[in-house]
């Protein structure tokens, strides 16, 4: 490999011709310092009658640019600058890769071409011969052997089918047994669940009977409450016995003549009547009972007149 470079002047194109069996590689281009600021220079190359733009240089922004261009034949470099020169640099190298490729191709082709050809032919030939022999032997013998060979196969197939069906039947029976066992287990579980559900329901009627008993007992307490009012009348009777007189009933009858009769009929009364003669009985006489007898006689007379 050898370094290479060329300076291209304004308005002048520079031709470059690579040597035989060699290549020219352009890697970089740059401007001189004499170029004014703000001026841009366009770089171009002409190969085989075609002019191509390869880049643009500027003193302020892009004073140099990198390339990776390889040429194996004559080419021409130029630029659009008016005062500055453009320098192209790179290197030369021998064209060795082409020889390597050709030699490798030449070596690979003879080795690859003859090797697969005989193997393919022999394999195909052997296979073809085997196929022909296999075809000719059964053709020589008629189809008498085929039915004999097919019958045991069919019998074997029938037997295998029968075995498969019997196995399937056994599996189905097993499945039915398993299903029945599962159903029995489910029924037992359901019965147990029903028993468990029924057991907590038994105390409910007991609770329901309790309020009925309390309700039936309440009227009994009401009946017993009636004699409780009796003690209220006992002190009055004792006072009447002490006084020897009989008080009038709290609710007098509408007819005036019946009240004295009721007073005489009562066993506990002092034997008073509506008439004044009954008030003179000896067991009612006395100073202690005088006032009560007079009051009773007066009440009886008044009621009889009414």
UniProtKB/Swiss-Prot annotation:
Gene3D superfamilies for this protein: Nucleoplasmin core domain
Keyword Hydrolase (UniProt): yes
Alphabetical list of InterPro entries matching this protein: NPL
Acidic residues bias locations: 97-110, 152-198
Keywords in alphabetical order: Acetylation, Chromatin regulator, Developmental protein, Hydrolase, Nucleus, Phosphoprotein, Repressor, Transcription, Transcription regulation
Gene Ontology, cellular component aspect: mitochondrion; nucleolus; nucleus; plant-type cell wall; plant-type vacuole; plastid
Protein name: Histone deacetylase HDT2
Lineage: Eukaryota, Viridiplantae, Streptophyta, Embryophyta, Tracheophyta
Encoding gene, per UniProt annotation: HDT2
């Amino acid at each position: 490999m050898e370094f290479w470079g060329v300076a291209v002047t304004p308005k002048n194109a520079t031709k470059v011709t690579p040597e035989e069996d060699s290549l020219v590689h352009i890697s970089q281009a740059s401007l001189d310092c004499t170029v004014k600021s703000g001026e841009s220079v366009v770089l171009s190359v002409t190969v085989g009658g075609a002019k191509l733009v390869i880049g643009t240089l500027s003193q302020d922004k892009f004073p140099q640019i990198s390339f990776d261009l390889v040429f194996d034949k004559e080419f021409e470099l130029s630029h659009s600058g008016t005062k500055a020169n453009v320098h192209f640099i790179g290197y030369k190298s021998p064209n060795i890769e082409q020889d390597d490729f050709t030699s490798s191709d030449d070596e690979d082709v003879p080795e690859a071409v003859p090797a697969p050809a005989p193997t393919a032919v022999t394999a195909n030939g052997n296979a073809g011969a085997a196929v022909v022999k296999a075809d000719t032997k059964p053709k020589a013998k008629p189809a008498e052997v085929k039915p004999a060979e097919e019958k045991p196969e069919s019998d074997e197939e029938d037997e295998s089918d029968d075995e498969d069906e019997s196995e399937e039947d056994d599996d189905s029976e097993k499945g039915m047994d398993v299903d029945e066992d599962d159903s029995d287990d489910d029924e037992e579980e359901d019965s147990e669940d029903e028993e468990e559900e029924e057991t907590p329901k038994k105390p409910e009627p007991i609770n329901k009977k309790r309020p009925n008993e309390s309700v039936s007992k309440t009227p009994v307490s009401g009946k017993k409450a009636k004699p409780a009012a009796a003690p209220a009348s006992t002190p009055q009777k004792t006072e009447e016995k002490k006084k020897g007189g009989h008080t009038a009933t709290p609710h007098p009858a509408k007819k005036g003549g019946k009240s004295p009769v009721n007073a005489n009929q009562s066993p506990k009364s002092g034997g008073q009547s509506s008439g004044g003669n009954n008030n003179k009985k000896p067991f009612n006489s006395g100073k202690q009972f005088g006032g009560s007898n007079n009051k009773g006689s007066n009440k009886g007379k008044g009621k009889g007149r009414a």
